[in-house]
């Protein structure tokens, strides 16, 4: 408590009941930005697990590149959650642009994807930074595991863009995108080397 009070620049003896509106706003902002709170207990959650997600994506997509990540437990409004995500490129994936598969507590979300927080994070990503252009053969699988998924509607088909969820989704996608970028760079180098070799094979007999 003392450490947080120092971070928020409040005196430890300052009571919440005596705070004015401006101080309450300042306290709320500090609570949202403070990173040293204890992580929530994830024992009540049932994530897929990185290994199971990787095996499932490998079997279904047979990609040239595959990476998965499971983020540590976080919380929004006191409800714990875990973000799991996988990204796959090439192989049997068709070249029709980025395809996103969304799951929440192991249940696929099939409708109303346009206003979903996962789609928002994917669409806000500058894919050209990761050497992805045009309509790539790229698949993203996202799983939100929580004691209370913040659905936008009673139909439970899209997830609200809570800041805590959005932050964890962005960090998961950033981690995977960097790995994909490394793969694409190596792929480009290999293709360039192959072109050079073909040129040498073509013109060396003429020298």
Task: Report residues per predicted region.
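Helix-hairpin-helix
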Residues: 1-8
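Extended hydrophobic-aromatic, low-complexity segments
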Residues: 2, 13-14, 150-154
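Short helix/strand-bridging catalytic loops that position acidic/His residues to coordinate divalent metals
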Residues: 9-14, 156-160
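GHKL/Bergerat-fold ATPase module in large chromosome/replication-associated machines
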Residues: 12-14, 20-134
């Amino acid at each position: 408590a003392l450490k947080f009070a120092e971070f928020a620049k409040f005196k430890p003896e300052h009571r919440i009941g005596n705070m004015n509106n401006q101080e309450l706003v300042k306290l709320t902002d500090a609570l949202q930005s403070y990173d040293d709170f204890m992580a929530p207990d994830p024992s009540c959650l049932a994530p897929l697990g990185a290994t199971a997600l990787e095996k499932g994506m490998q079997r279904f997509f047979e990609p040239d590149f595959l990476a998965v990540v499971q983020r540590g437990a976080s919380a929004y409004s006191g409800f714990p959650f875990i973000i799991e995500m996988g990204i796959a490129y090439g192989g049997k994936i068709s070249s029709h642009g980025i395809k996103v598969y969304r799951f929440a507590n192991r249940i696929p979300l099939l409708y109303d994807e346009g206003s979903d927080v996962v789609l928002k994070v994917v669409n806000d990503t500058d894919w050209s930074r990761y050497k992805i252009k045009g309509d790539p053969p790229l698949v993203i699988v996202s799983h939100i595991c929580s004691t209370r998924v913040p659905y936008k509607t009673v139909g439970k088909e899209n997830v609200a863009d809570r800041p805590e969820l959005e932050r964890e989704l962005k960090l998961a996608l950033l981690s995977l995108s960097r790995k994909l970028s490394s793969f694409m760079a190596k792929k480009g180098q290999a293709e360039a080397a192959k072109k050079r070799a073909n040129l040498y094979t073509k013109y060396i007999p003429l020298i």
